[in-house]
Amino acid sequence: MEYKREVSVAEDPKKRIQHFNEFHEHLPKEKQRLQGARCMECGVPFCQSGMMICGMASGCPLHNLVPEWNDLVYTGNWQQAYNRLKKTNNFPEFTSRVCPALCEAACTCGLNGDPVSTKENEYAIIENAYSEGYAAAKPPVVRTGKKVAVIGSGPSGLAAADLLNQRGHQVTVFERSDRVGGLLMYGIPNMKLEKQIIDRKINIMKEEGVTFVTGTDIGKDIKASKLLHDFDRVVLACGASNPRDINAPGRDAKGIYFAVDFLKANTRSLLDSNFEDKKYVETKGKNVVIIGGGDTGNDCVGTSIRHGAKSVTQIEMMPKAPDKRAENNPWPEWPKVCKTDYGQEEAIAVYGHDPRIYESTVKEFIKDKNGNLKAVKIVKLSWEKDPATGRMKMQEIAGSEQILDAEIVLIAAGFLGTQKYIADAFGVELNERTNVKTVPGKYQTSVENVFVTGDMHRGQSLVVWAIREGREAAHAVDESLMGYSNLVIQ
């Protein structure tokens, strides 16, 4: 390989914890151009395949035309690179920041070396498009006269709204929160995705004709029947926002929060007053225990540290993953390897050790005499294969209990599905996983003219999957309205 992989440089952990801004210094344009040259333009580009292997995606679910725009970056044709990128992805400004880069995990270069830095090429393309004016608003020339309501302004709802508006339908997006963006706005901290990036795109969508209504909770503030009367079609894109709880003794202790509420309050206070209103969960000088080893748990680690937590511990039920691919996890499968994310890096820098405790779960929340949380009892787990089902099952290890000091606990244990009142308001059926039920591979619900998309449809997932769902749902809605669809979704 003529050129070595180069990526953006992260600010030193001890410096970046002093602020809540993005903290990567990206490559200059010429160096980024050379990174495009590393792409081999494979005859079978696994990077854009988006196929499921062993229940996990390999390659980009959006089927981004990765080899094409990598080559266009290398040849310096930035505008055409942007055009090819936007053909399959409505929001590269989001995915180039928060996607785990499924494309890179499936890159052929990664077989015997370092994969192409596709995610950073994507970032360079979209940011160059904004600086050069390529990303300006392009309102549809013709309107169909059809009206569509999209309920929820997360990545899936926004993707559906964007495509349906491009088709010429009049789209109104309803958001129950005070700001547009859903998960992007309040579920992802500012240091991963600065909120002005979301606002920048929303303002373009407004110029293109999309209407946004915030602070309106459909099913409560406005009846579902009114929307069904006022609009030709309704798209439910409300996410999977029902958090999984930890029902251990002492759960009623003061100081236990769901991670999603913790992160939302933090971002809202940051945007409203730069934390001067004090309307966030204060972790300064406190021992914080985070239950959950995923991305949300990591975001809680980074956020707690920025507020001056005395200590941060992250509890993970699963065993620690290997540092390199195991023999039974070959390319191009998603690599099940140990990842140390930005929050954990910061914890190591501040406290001198990795915050994670593996193969453990909470046994009890311990309260003081006033009902305040003062400690957490955890227990070690062992994992064994059930001979009857072949599935792994966990067992507590007797005598392995441990007490952790904790004034704050943040539960980041995933989500159980959508808020039931929304489904009830429209009368749509739910499946056994409490997601809205559709015919497999389709987006029409059990109620006429009501469609569903995103996490509300497939369950908790990645932003890139949400965008794909939104695009496919838009195609289904358009076909329902017009009898055919000329929307290109992949």
Where do the model's predicted regions map?
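FAD-site-proximal beta/loop scaffold in flavoenzymes
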Residues: 254-285, 384-460
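Beta1-alpha1 glycine-rich phosphate/pyrophosphate-binding loop at the start
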Residues: 2-9, 13-25, 34-37, 61-75, ...
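C-terminal catalytic lobe of FAD-dependent flavoproteins
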Residues: 4-6, 10-30, 35-38, 43, ...
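Immediate flanking context of iron-sulfur cluster ligation sites
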Residues: 24-54, 78-102
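Feature captures the FAD/FMN-dependent oxidoreductase FAD-binding
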Residues: 80, 142, 147-151, 199-249, ...
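A conserved FAD-binding loop/helix module that cradles the flavin
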Residues: 297-300, 307, 453-487
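Glycine-rich Rossmann-fold phosphate-binding loop(s) that bind the pyrophosphate
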Residues: 152-155, 292-294, 455
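Glycine-rich dinucleotide-binding loop and its adjacent helix/turn
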Residues: 124-142, 200-220, 243-307, 430-442, ...
